Structures are given as C-alpha cells and as structure tokens.
C-alpha cells in the first residue's frame, strides 16, 4: 500500500521527511515529493505550497503519478470552536469551502457547482484515528477533536471573517487554506482521505503572532499523530 501525505509548508512536512528511510526527492511543477518509508509503510510525502490551487495541483500530480491508496493531510489550522487550545488536534469528518458562493444558482454556500457541499473523511480512517488518539491523548494536556474544517484562500483572523464563516458554518471547528481542495481531488479520484491538523492559533487578532510562535509545535503534533496512525494502516 502506498500512502500519500500532504503538507503545505516545509515546517509541516519536516518531521515526517526526517522520519523517512530511503528518501528520493522529485520536484514536479514546483511541488516537492519525497518517496520513502515511514513505520514500514510506503509513503509519498508532498510539500505542496500554500493555498487551494497549490494543494489541488500537488494532490492531482500525486494521484496521477504515484497512485496512493490513501491520502492524509497534515499541518496547522486556526481554532474556531470554544475550548480549543494551541496544540490540540483536529480530525476532520467533513470539509467545506468557506469562500465559494454560487447560491444564486441554488447551490449551498461553500459548494462548488456539481460537487458535494461537504467532503467526507474516510470512515475507516476516522475510526482508527479515534481509537488511537483516545489513548495517545489520555495523559496529555492537549486533546483530539472531530468535526468540520472550513478552507479559505485567506488567513482568518478578523471579526468580519469570523462572522461570515460562523453564519454559514455554525459548527465549524477549525479553518485553514488547503484541506477542502485536497479533499475535492481525492473525491474525484475516489481515494480515501483524512485531514489531521493541529491548532497553531485561534483565528483571532493575535493569530499572526501565535502562528509564527507555534507553527513548529502544531506541525510536530500533527506529524506525530500521523506517524501513530501509519502504524495501524
């Protein structure tokens, strides 16, 4: 089985890359692929670049050229739900776009025409993650939460951005800039996927400071959780 893992930034893939054995690097159209093994599993690790277009491009290249049987997205996210703290992990059971509006034609806010309104994380992978992380976080000050992640081509920190997202997605847990695009490509290629992100900021007016300070913590937390999951796949 080949497992695809995608992170947007160098910081988000560094720990995973350093955990790989027999690493081969390939660059295609600016997307950096690292091919090797983690936890005795064949892995294709992608540093895609930031934003939905980079994520979609890289995921498409991965799906077409490397044929992964599973795709996992790692990285950081901004927490939107009450009670979340930096270092908590969000496992997405659903994903949506927060900046797509074709409602005049009868679509749900966030829905790309002729695509689902929400992209569903793979139920089998979700179940495995839930079992693993219940034990993993039992003695930790952080926690794993499950729910809706919303993707925007903007860094969310202003009250007006919050208001729009909460109006259309009142149960949102976290926001970020790539996951729904990865999910859409995985959906179109019929590849099971799971989004595992760690909270780097609380998507508020201190978010830029928090992100810069805690991106490495969030990346480490997310990557560590993924390595634990790989041991069970």
Curated annotation (Swiss-Prot):
Function statement: Catalyzes the irreversible cleavage of the glycosidic bond in both 5'-methylthioadenosine (MTA) and S-adenosylhomocysteine (SAH/AdoHcy) to adenine and the corresponding thioribose, 5'-methylthioribose and S-ribosylhomocysteine, respectively. Also cleaves 5'-deoxyadenosine, a toxic by-product of radical S-adenosylmethionine (SAM) enzymes, into 5-deoxyribose and adenine.
EC number from the UniProt entry: 3.2.2.9
Record GO terms (molecular function): adenosylhomocysteine nucleosidase activity; methylthioadenosine nucleosidase activity
Keyword check for Lipoprotein: no
InterPro entries linked: MTA_SAH_Nsdase (IPR010049), Nucleoside_phosphorylase_d (IPR000845), Nucleoside_phosphorylase_sf (IPR035994)
Key words of the record: Amino-acid biosynthesis, Hydrolase, Methionine biosynthesis
Reactions listed under catalytic activity: S-adenosyl-L-homocysteine + H2O = S-(5-deoxy-D-ribos-5-yl)-L-homocysteine + adenine; S-methyl-5'-thioadenosine + H2O = 5-(methylsulfanyl)-D-ribose + adenine; 5'-deoxyadenosine + H2O = 5-deoxy-D-ribose + adenine
Active site: 12 (proton acceptor), 201 (proton donor)
Residues where substrate binds: 78, 156, 177-178
GO annotations of cellular component type: cytosol
Root EC class: hydrolase
Descriptive protein name: 5'-methylthioadenosine/S-adenosylhomocysteine nucleosidase
CDD domains: MTAN
Record GO biological process: L-methionine salvage from methylthioadenosine; L-methionine salvage from S-adenosylmethionine; nucleoside catabolic process
The keyword Amino-acid biosynthesis appears for this protein: yes
UniProt record similarity statement: Belongs to the PNP/UDP phosphorylase family. MtnN subfamily.
Pathway involvement of the protein, from the record: Amino-acid biosynthesis; L-methionine biosynthesis via salvage pathway; S-methyl-5-thio-alpha-D-ribose 1-phosphate from S-methyl-5'-thioadenosine (hydrolase route): step 1/2
